[in-house]
């Protein structure tokens, strides 16, 4: 069983390093990135994790409410490739199941590690439309209930089928990125150091 060094979750109003869905060929390797000086990379005018071959392909969530689970799975994949903890996978072969994350968020049992004591999950209807968030995902993965590989069934036992184990999750405050230079520096450093971040925002819909 391998351990994920870090999965980042953050709530930000503006994405700092925009990444398009167009695939790019890696110009350097993940090993090059691991051997680079983070402080120097942060000061560059541009940083793109795709240049190092650590960004997995874009996936379509369909009409589900699992954007947060897809984001968590993708950030986890990049973190794994960035850290180099699993030499048997690359950006083409590593695929974690967002469906398992979504299902387990609303259908899991007790936490054997007691990392989420007191948390109450209450949802009705189809779990794939029940919603969630990246902080909820970090809480779930802190119990080691997943992540599982995409070739597993979404309702598989997450504890016995976890492909990796989360060691820590880091939250970066991104509320003032467009005004606070120090906040932007911290966000840049997080992206460079861990390869990716997730972010959440609340889109309130009004009917007329």
Predicted regions and their residues:
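Bacterial N-terminal signal peptides
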Residues: 10-19
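Bacterial N-terminal signal peptides that target proteins for export
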Residues: 1-9
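Catalytic-core signature of thiol
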Residues: 25-208
């Amino acid at each position: 069983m391998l351990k994920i060094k870090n999965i980042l979750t953050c709530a930000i109003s503006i994405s700092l390093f925009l990444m398009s869905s167009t695939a790019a060929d890696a110009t350097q390797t993940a090993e090059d990135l691991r051997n680079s000086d983070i402080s120097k990379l942060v000061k560059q005018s541009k940083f793109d994790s795709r240049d190092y071959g650590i960004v997995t392909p874009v996936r379509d969530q369909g009409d589900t409410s699992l954007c947060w689970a897809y984001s968590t799975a993708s950030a986890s994949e990049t973190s794994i490739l960035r850290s180099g903890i699993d030499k048997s996978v690359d950006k083409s072969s590593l695929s974690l199941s967002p469906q398992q994350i979504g299902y387990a968020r609303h259908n899991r049992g007790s936490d054997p590690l007691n990392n989420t004591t007191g948390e109450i999950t209450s949802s009705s209807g189809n779990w794939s439309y029940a919603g969630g968030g990246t902080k909820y995902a970090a809480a779930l993965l802190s119990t080691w209930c997943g992540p599982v590989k995409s070739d597993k069934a979404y309702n598989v036992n997450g504890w016995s089928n976890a492909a990796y184990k989360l060691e820590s999750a880091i939250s970066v405050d991104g509320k003032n990125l467009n005004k606070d230079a120090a906040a932007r520096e911290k966000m840049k450093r997080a992206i460079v150091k861990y390869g990716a971040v997730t972010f959440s925002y609340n889109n309130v819909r009004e009917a007329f």
